[in-house]
Structures are given as C-alpha cells and as structure tokens.
C-alpha cells in the first residue's frame, strides 16, 4: 500500500468529520472543487486541512502514539501498586534479608493493573522543523498538488480567536467561541434528535443551504445559548429537555393530531420511536438479567451466523464469545467495516467506514426475524422463562403475569393476559414434552427450564412493538 495515500485519506476524513460533527457542514464536498451550494472554497478546505496535516501518521498496524488514560478508580489502584513496589524496593536495599520474591510479585501485580487500563490513540503534532507544507490537491488528487496554503479556518466563519495558537488547539477554541453559534446549535440539535427521534433541524448532518430549515428556530437558539451558558453540560441539557412538559406529554395520537401533525414536527405529542440497534439487543439481555455490567476492555464477538464473517488476508476468525463476554453491551462488539454484525446492521447500525451523523430508521420484516431468531434474543428469552418459572403456580397465569411485567414494566390487562394464556397453551402443543422440537428450543436458549412454551412466550414478549419502542 501507499503510505502517503492512506495518510492523506485519513487526514481528509478528520477534516470532513470535524466540520460535520461540530458545524453541521458538508465540507467534504470542497475537497475536489469549491462547494456547489455553500460558500466554502477549495482553498478554504485545504487551509483547514493544514491544521490536521501536521500530525504523526503512518500506515502502521498498531495504534501509536497512545496516551495512558486510566479512570479515577484505575488511577488509584495503579498508584497504590506503584507505591508498594517502591516501598518494597527501598526496604530490600536497606535490609540484609532477601526480598526479591516480594518485589517480583508486586511488580507483576503492578503490570497486571497496567494491562487493564486503556491506552487511547491520539494525534501528536510533528516537531517544528518537520512540519509539512500543505498544498491544494487538484481535483482532490494528492499526486497533483497546486498552490501552497497556510492553516486557516473558512473565511465565512471569521478568524481564530485572538491569541489562539495556529494549530488544532486553536481550532477547538474557534469552535467553542461565543461568536460561533453553529457548534452549540448542532450539538443541541443532535441531543434533541436522540430524545425525540428527529431533530429540530431534521438534517442533522447538514445545516447548509441544502439542509432542511429548523421547525422551531427560536427554540433551537434558546437551547444553544442555555447549553453554552451552562458550560456545555450535556447532563444539564438532557435534564432540561426531559423535564419539559413537551417531552412529558402522552404519546397517544388522535385522528385530529394525525391529520394536523402526522410526523410530530409541531410536537403535539411525546415522541414514540424504535430503540437503536444496540439498545434493542442490550435491553433484551438486561431484562433477562444477562447483560454484563463490565465497563471498558477489549472488543468481544457475540454470536452471529457461521460464514458471515471471513478474513481473506489475516486469517482472523469470528470466535463466538462465551461466559460474560457473550453478553457484553453491544457497544463492545468487534466491528469489521466490510462485515458489520448482521443483527445490528439490520436495525440500521452503521458500518464504521465513516462517521455517521444520523441513522435513517427503517422498518422491515427482517428486523422481526432477528428479534425472534437471533441467538442473543433466544438466549434472553430462555433466561426470562427461567425467571418466570420461579412464580409457577396452579394456573399458567401465575407465571405469565410476572413475565409480562418483567418485560413491559406494567401489569397485563385482562385481555392481554387472556391472549398470553392462549399463546402459552398453543405453544405447549407446538413443543410437547419430550419432543425433538422442545429439546432443540431449550438447548438453543440455554435455559435451565424445560418449559419450551414459556420460552416461546418470552420470545414473543421481547418482540412486541411496545418492547422495542421508546415510550
């Protein structure tokens, strides 16, 4: 591979991502020619590119350079282990008795603590005497350089703050300065979209002339100013939104509201949208008490169908995780960009090739097949059935009531309970005691119970619209 080609592609991706994430601008359109719709020239693009063009980059297999980034708890453990090693070494030097073994054990303990702490990949600037000259790329081709440019932000948005360094730290200051209203607006809009299902500006990724106008411009501006005045606190922003009377409305829709506000752009009711891909899986595991609570660590490989994931060059294989790693949060799922996890992809998760600002939510039959048949959901149903079995009584309803409440966090209404009982009795006929069908379902679910009918009912409850939808 051409090392410089990949380095340039990575730098351009950082430029595009920075401007789209923080400014809501499709600046990547200006890498080959001046932007067709927004007032951003090709010179603006490469002047901004110059800020990111001075970092140590190479097409290496490792993540260097990295920064040692322990959590507060990890830092205390690491410091305590380090102090123990220093103390034992000092005592060893001052004592005629041998203490080599104790020092060795303590150093091993220190190294084990170090291994649990993340090393975060960072960008480190080149030394002053090694700085690169940035040139405009004709038609975006790095092999066809044109005029040299100096590092600068797009003219449309004003210069760097007075006294700010002409590097990436200066860009950060520029993004957050009060004279730049876009950063706060774009961030507030993104949080609003996560809570309401759609942003005040629907096109989260494009605040330019081709993006859609805000449905409530004054509200967007007020939230942006309030966000900045509260020192960019996301916690405060989320609290102010979810405690509002607008958010706390009922999600019920009437014919009048449907006619006047079909997409809820006027906020006539509370949002009701399907959970994200990762949350759909994590919720099922959490309801079944299977979700592993561990924070941080290496990526894991939860179950997926055989043959989906193959690596031609490295020989790496998808090894279905076992034990606690099997049920880690979906955030930790190993991501191969050419072959994302199929269950997550079916629910609109991104492939990881580029930064995805907004997921377009789809509704397909394939999604129901995932929640009914995918291994994680079947095993979650098995664990739920096992929990429900603890409430078993003389009547099927004795187990079905708590099972329903475990999943939907409310007691079932009488017609709902009647349908559940009828479903359970039907499933008993589908999976009779001692049958091969019963054995296969119980085995697939990993459940301790042999009640295949209860597993099937739990599976149906996990697949309900009410379960998969944010109320």
Question: What are these regions, as identified by a protein language model?
Answer:
Residues 1-82, 344, 356:
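Sequence context surrounding c-type heme c attachment/ligation sites in exported
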Residues 457:
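Short, surface-exposed polybasic-aromatic patches that bind anionic ligands, especially phosphate groups
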Residues 8-10, 38-39, 79-325, 344, ...:
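Primarily short, surface-exposed interaction patches in extracytoplasmic proteins
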Residues 329, 336-347:
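Active-site Gly/Thr loop motif
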């Amino acid at each position: 591979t051409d090392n410089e080609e990949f380095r340039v592609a990575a730098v351009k991706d950082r430029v595009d991502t920075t401007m789209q994430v923080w400014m809501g601008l499709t600046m990547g359109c200006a890498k080959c020619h001046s932007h067709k719709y927004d007032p951003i020239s090709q010179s603006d693009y490469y002047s901004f590119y110059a800020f990111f063009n001075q970092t140590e980059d190479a097409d290496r297999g490792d993540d260097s350079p990295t920064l040692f980034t322990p959590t507060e708890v990890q830092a205390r453990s690491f410091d305590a282990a380090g102090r123990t090693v220093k103390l034992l070494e000092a005592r060893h030097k001052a004592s005629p008795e041998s203490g080599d073994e104790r020092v060795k054990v303590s150093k091993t303990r220190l190294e084990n603590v170090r291994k649990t702490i993340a090393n975060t990949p960072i960008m480190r600037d080149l030394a002053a005497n090694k700085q690169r000259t940035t040139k405009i790329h004709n038609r975006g081709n790095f092999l066809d350089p044109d005029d040299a440019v100096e590092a600068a932000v797009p003219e449309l948005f004003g210069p760097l703050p007075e006294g700010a360094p002409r590097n990436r730290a200066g860009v950060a200051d520029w993004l957050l300065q009060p004279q730049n209203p876009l950063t706060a607006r774009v961030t507030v809009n993104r949080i609003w979209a996560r809570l309401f299902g759609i942003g005040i500006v629907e096109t989260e990724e494009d605040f330019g002339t081709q993006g859609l106008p805000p449905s409530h411009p004054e509200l967007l501006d007020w939230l942006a100013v309030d966000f900045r005045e509260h020192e960019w606190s996301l916690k405060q922003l989320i609290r102010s939104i979810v405690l509002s009377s607008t958010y706390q409305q009922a999600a019920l829709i009437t014919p009048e509201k449907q006619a006047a506000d079909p997409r809820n752009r006027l906020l006539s009711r509370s949002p009701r949208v399907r959970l994200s891909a990762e949350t759909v899986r994590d919720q099922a595991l959490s309801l079944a008490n299977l979700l592993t609570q561990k924070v941080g660590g290496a990526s894991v490989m939860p179950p997926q169908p055989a043959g989906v994931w193959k690596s031609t060059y490295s020989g790496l294989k998808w090894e279905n995780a076992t034990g606690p790693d099997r049920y880690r949060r979906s955030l930790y799922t190993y991501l191969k960009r050419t072959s994302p996890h199929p269950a997550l992809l079916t629910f609109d998760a991104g492939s990881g090739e580029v930064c995805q600002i907004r997921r377009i939510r789809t509704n397909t039959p394939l999604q129901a097949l995932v929640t009914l048949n995918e291994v994680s959901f079947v095993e979650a149903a098995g664990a739920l059935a096992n929990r429900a079995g603890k409430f078993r009584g003389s009547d099927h309803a004795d187990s079905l009531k708590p099972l329903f409440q475990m999943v939907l966090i409310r007691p079932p209404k009488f017609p709902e309970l009647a349908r559940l009982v009828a479903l359970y009795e039907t499933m008993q006929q589908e999976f009779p005691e001692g049958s091969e069908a019963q054995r296969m379902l119980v085995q697939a679910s990993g459940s301790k119970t042999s009640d295949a009918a209860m597993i099937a009912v739990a599976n149906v409850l996990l697949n309900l619209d009410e379960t998969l939808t944010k109320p």
